[in-house]
Amino acid sequence: MEKDITDYLVVHPDQSTLYRVGEEPITYAEGKLTDKAKTRYLNIRVQLEKGYLEDKINECSQPDVKIENLSKEHMELIDKMVDSITSEVGRAIVGLTVLQLTLKSIEPAQSIRLHKGSNNSNAFSWQEGVPMRVLDKNFITPVLRKYGLLKLNADGFMMTRSLAENYPYSGLYKAAIRGARSEWIEITNLVEDGHLHPEDSLKYMISSLLNKSDEFQKLSDDTLVILEKYLDSGVDYKAILTLIQEFVETSEYSARIFEVSIHSFSQALDELKLLAGHLKPLSQMRSANKKHGNIGDIEVTSTKNSLSIIEAWDAKYGKSYMRDELEEISDKLELHVETEI
């Protein structure tokens, strides 16, 4: 018998079995929730009632938010999903991904493929499922609307019929989903397989949504107006430098503000065509940059998509002992033979 070369789903009257290439088959039994599923659902509700998602949004609103367990590829995957949102499509699937990552962050044992769960014998349910529509309407959509992260109907994105078919969420899910379907499936698979950190993925997605929110854009526009007025007032560069230094020294997030300041100076050099290559954007948050192949906070690469770093600056503020920092840079340089101090 030839080896299977594609995924497939076997549907029985009381269960479904998902076969994926390179993975063990998983059977999802239908029926009323098990005691373990009830316990997980209760904990999820309790944590959401306590403001779990709002706490994550507030955490991601801070300049020093840390996201340490995502690779560059994982970040790009989430970026593609967020960037796919338009006025017409993409919002429901992003909302669903936020819901899935939230559930998995609270209860790692909960499958995020099984979107229905009930004790009602007349309703379709998986024994290890979870009622995502209920959780969405009560805890996810209201919070996303409150913070302006997604423009959603008040009834919730799970009211979309295409997300409510009685099949597990997988690459074999039959309904026509508008938006970043392939990215959603990949994220779902990675999380379920234990290859994608759900909490850090949630925080990264929230951070991306915050940066795209109308409120953030308005704040950015207002800031630029204030800046133009300040520059037109005739202030000299020494006063500007003093203002920046005072802001760094008095900020609650001095280390991060220092990084932003140095990168801002680099942007000015870049606009004047004084850099030898492409200036990489500053990371949205402070992360484990060694894992991502970075050397410093500010990096100039030979071309836009090149991994060849020709100049890097690692901003350090308030560090009295630099030996550990230098050893860390030494470790990073081992990954970049084209670079030297």
Predicted regions and their residues:
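A short, surface-exposed helix-loop junction/capping segment
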Residues: 235-251
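Charge-rich, low-complexity terminal tails
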Residues: 2-4, 256, 268
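Hydrophobic/aromatic-lined pockets within catalytic cores
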Residues: 210, 214, 248-249, 267-274
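Extended, H/D-rich, highly charged conserved domains that either
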Residues: 250-260
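Catalytic core segments in nucleotide and nucleic-acid processing enzymes
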Residues: 260, 265-341
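Interfaces and regulatory segments of ATP-dependent nucleotide/adenylate/phosphodiester-chemistry enzymes
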Residues: 28-240
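Intrinsically disordered, low-structural-confidence terminal and linker regions
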Residues: 1-25
